[in-house]
Amino acid sequence: SNAYRTTGVDANIVNMTYKEVKTLDAGSWFSDEYVGENVPSLKEVLELTQGKIKLNIELKPADNGTALAKNTVRLIEKYNMVNDCVITSFSESVLKAVKTYNQEIKVGYILSAAYGDFYDMKNVDFFSVNAAFLSKRTIDAIHNSGKRVYAWTVNNKESIKNLTNKGVDGIITDNPVLARETIYSRDTSETIVNMIRYVFNQ
């Protein structure tokens, strides 16, 4: 994962030390109010959010997939957030490793495209699929396999309504305020309100 989008530094996190990462300014891109805000560690995020919100933690392994899965699971367990976190990844092997360490943690496989019989994958609780590839047929096939499906990344009102009408179980967005306003607006059906749960059942 590259740090440029949120810090302005064109460097891959995997090639940086923890100390180097902590010197990055991760707040300026968002708002002048947050200039100088450091990149938080997962430990810091869990400490801050424990008992307050639920988290979708995406793992992006380099050559350390098993260790990354183990350390992430141990931190989640330490803060008693097994039921408050899901783990997602493009790496099936990392998700399998997560399940090896704790079967109770829900894991989701991220897909850039939806082709073939991917929905029959074992050790996966749900799929996070590029919204451009989510037809009603694909959504139904995933549901028929007993799994849930979430659409990414959806940042406009019409797409949110369209996908929820097709039956997705949740929306992944960069604009949660817009998503919430769309879901609970007067012109949004009760069916959509009931279906959308931002990855977790609320």
Regions found by a protein language model. Name each.
Residues 1-106, 129, 143-145, 199-201:
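Metal-dependent phosphodiesterase/phospholipase catalytic core, i.e.
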Residues 32-36, 108-202:
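C-terminal active-site rim and adjoining tail of enzyme catalytic domains
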